[in-house]
Amino acid sequence: MSRPRRRGRDVHGVLLLDKPQGLSSNDALQKVKRIYNANRAGHTGALDPLATGMLPICLGEATKFSQYLLDSDKRYRVIARLGQRTDTSDADGTVVEERPVTFSEQQLQDALESFRGDTLQVPTMFSALKYQGKPLYEYARQGIEVPREARPITVYELLFIRHEGDELELEVHCSKGTYIRTIIDDLGEKLGCGAHVIYLRRLTVSKYPVERMVTLEQLNALLEEAQTRDIAPSELLDPLLMPMDSPAADYPVVNLPLTSSVYFKNGNPVRTTGAPSEGLVRVTEGEAQKFLGMGEIDSEGRVAPRRLVVEYPV
């Protein structure tokens, strides 16, 4: 007889986790889900186990809007080891080639310049992108290389921080879908010495404030404090959450009057003033501007529902 499924609570929002090194993004997600006793949870844009930094964890209804964070810009600090190339392009892999580091500082600056702006990037085999339904890393672990299409990316900023011996430190502000490991591997090839990532930290995702990041240690400490004070953990944990609509913060807002919002919530497109002429919009209602979900301007200029919040009783 199967054990009845444990019922969590309906908690909605985005936690900005400072993911520790050595933990997979999914393991970090499960820890946060347990700490919050949440019914649903999902992360937006995995970080490698080697990487640390901002990992937005969406809880409850916020999971419906996590896809919009996948499209956002990100900023990283990375340290590369020069002179060694690995099969995964980071320190978790096996060294497959060693070469002397002989480039000049001018050659380094010229190489860095070639990565700035709009470029095409061939994703690493050690990635979660899928080929014929399977993640690329599953093929890579079997020693199989499959064709990958080059994808357009944008590197808005590539800042040189330091070059000391066989270490090179950079800061990268980039578009969605950019693999920092691939940038470092490609840079190593351009410099003729090979390179791989030994340190990677995601500094920011979209416009989320860095000061709102929290660690697993801080979350567990709050759990202990709640137990000591004999209060519900939610009293200490829930104030850490960003609003459930924050993943879609970059989209324009359309506020519907209560007379129109009832139709919108029932799945019908509605006409309203002040809406853009096209594209996705964040829809709110009334004076309180309560978030209803995402809409899209249809061919008749109406706001059509695309993804709505389920209204839970308080």
UniProtKB/Swiss-Prot annotation:
EC numbers, comma separated: 5.4.99.25
Catalytic residue positions: D48 (nucleophile)
Record keywords, A-Z: Isomerase, tRNA processing
Family recorded in the similarity comment: Belongs to the pseudouridine synthase TruB family. Type 1 subfamily.
Role description: Responsible for synthesis of pseudouridine from uracil-55 in the psi GC loop of transfer RNAs.
UniProt-listed HAMAP family: TruB_bact (MF_01080)
Listed name of the protein: tRNA pseudouridine synthase B
